[in-house]
Regions:
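Flexible, substrate/cofactor-facing loop regions flanked by secondary structure
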Residues: 106-178
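Conserved N-terminal entry element of GNAT/NAT acetyltransferase domains
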Residues: 1-6, 96-117
């Protein structure tokens, strides 16, 4: 028998047949506010209690539930037994040129634009639409374009068809090299050529690159395929509608 007791400060204590088995913290994300976010702090993850526990929380909170964590078999079994579905896997890349799967062929011209320029703003328009589309089936974007774009890196690299950008990447220096923070495209069929040119260009400036690649983002997956690396695990998103 599972019971949950609201403790204030965004926290529920969880009891199993009267025994305290930890707590669950609830939070909100203004960028994706159709879901309530859960952080699990339990002392046991027994799949036999999952359905009862999460049914109670879902009813109590009145919105779909979202959990994000590094997946392990124990947690996967616990969450799916409770009705959660793994909707997204995020792979964290930390790569150097020695990790390349194939020689790069830089075949497109890159244009750099800084925050405040017309080209930068156009790329922001495209990214907002692209990000919204690739996240809609996982956790819909719920902030305005102005708010979303206010936190983007100040530099975008893009390729053009005529006067219009078709592929783009928002990048910024980090502690070890460059982070490719966001990528997007209007044409998946030619994005790989852009990605090769992008990576080639950045490796002229630094020794290492980082990126987070969601399996729901086809452009990010094409970027990831440029590297021959073994990634241990992923940071996953689970949803209970």
């Amino acid at each position: 028998m599972i019971s949950i007791v609201w403790q204030g400060d965004h926290r529920y204590n969880v009891y199993r047949s009267g025994e305290d088995i930890g707590c669950i913290t609830v939070s909100d994300n203004p960028c994706h506010n159709t879901h309530r976010y859960l952080n699990l702090g339990l002392t046991q993850y027994d799949p036999s209690i999952s359905k009862d526990l999460f049914s109670r929380l879902r009813k109590e909170l009145g919105q779909p539930l979202q959990i994000m964590l590094y997946s392990k078999p124990e947690m996967y079994n616990f969450l799916t037994a409770g009705g959660f579905e793994r909707k997204r896997r995020c792979y964290e890349l930390e790569v150097t040129s020695s990790d390349l799967a194939v020689p790069l062929i830089p075949a497109v011209e890159l244009h750099a634009a800084q925050k405040g320029s017309t080209l930068y703003d156009t790329c922001c328009d495209l990214l907002y639409a692209y990000y919204s589309a690739t996240h809609d089936t996982v956790s819909p974007l719920t902030v305005s374009q102005d708010v979303f774009c206010s936190d983007l890196p100040k530099t975008v690299l893009c390729s053009m068809v005529g006067s219009d950008p078709n592929h783009y990447a928002f990048v910024e220096p980090d502690e070890t090299g460059y982070e490719i923070a966001y990528v997007g495209t209007t044409d998946f069929s030619s994005f790989s050529c852009f990605a090769q040119t992008l990576v080639h260009e950045l490796f002229q400036k630094c020794d290492s690159l980082t990126a987070e690649c969601d399996d729901t983002d086809p452009a990010a997956m094409q970027l990831m395929q440029l590297f021959n690396i073994s990634i241990d695990g992923s940071y996953d998103t689970y949803i209970l509608e």
